[in-house]
Amino acid sequence: MVPRLSAGTPPASPARWLAGRLAVVTGASQGIGAATAAAMAAAGAHVVLAARDQHALDEVAGRINDAGGQATPLPTDVSNEAAVQRLFAEVAGVGQVAALVCAAGVLTPARFAETTSAMWDETLRVNLTGTFLCCRAAFTAMVPAGEGRIVTIGSLSGVYATEKFPGLAAYNVSKYGVIGLTEAIAVEGKEHGISAICLSPGAVDTEMLRRANPALRPGLTPDDVADLIVALLDSRLAPASGANIPLFSNA
């Protein structure tokens, strides 16, 4: 059984664990990543923003810094191992990474029989391999500190026994993989004080989803997801480490 949370009922957050800590958010140029970076900065974290689009990344960082937060943009292709290594080397120059949120992702809808090898490879390379590369780098950096918190982004499309839709074969597989990866990180992170949790939202009103399915009416906003991520990071994650939390519609 997985716990079911709605966007309107985030867990209590009596203390700001994030305050004064260094965090990395991938996919931070738009959507869930951008909203999460802003929410984490508002909670007092110094947020390193990672994404491929430098212009969009600079805009997000500018808004956060103008609002009194602290954000450092570092353009990165999370599917490139060397780029991820450079990212975390630069992060180490800033300070000790305490939290990672993996929100980078792609969605290219295609019927199963029409899914090309290139579509398949790109989806898994960004959504799953990119998450693996960033989690591995962050995990390695967190071990000496004896603590760390990792949040990955799955999807209801990757949750067993939820309704599935046509055209999402590669995407669904990538998100099933992210959920399994998070469980593995939690198992090995326990002895190092590192917690990992996966948040699997339903349809979120993002540019990526609008491009993929303009007719879909999302029941969640990026801020809904971001607020829950911050609440989770500010709470004691250890007892729930390894869990996958489905996030259902706010409607």
Model-derived segments and spans:
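C-terminal helical subdomain
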Residues: 2, 191-194, 198-199, 214-251
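Substrate-binding pocket helix/loop in short-chain dehydrogenase/reductase
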Residues: 111-112, 119-124
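Conserved glycine-rich cofactor-binding loop
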Residues: 22, 29-30
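Active-site-adjacent segment of SDR/Rossmann-fold oxidoreductases
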Residues: 163, 184-194
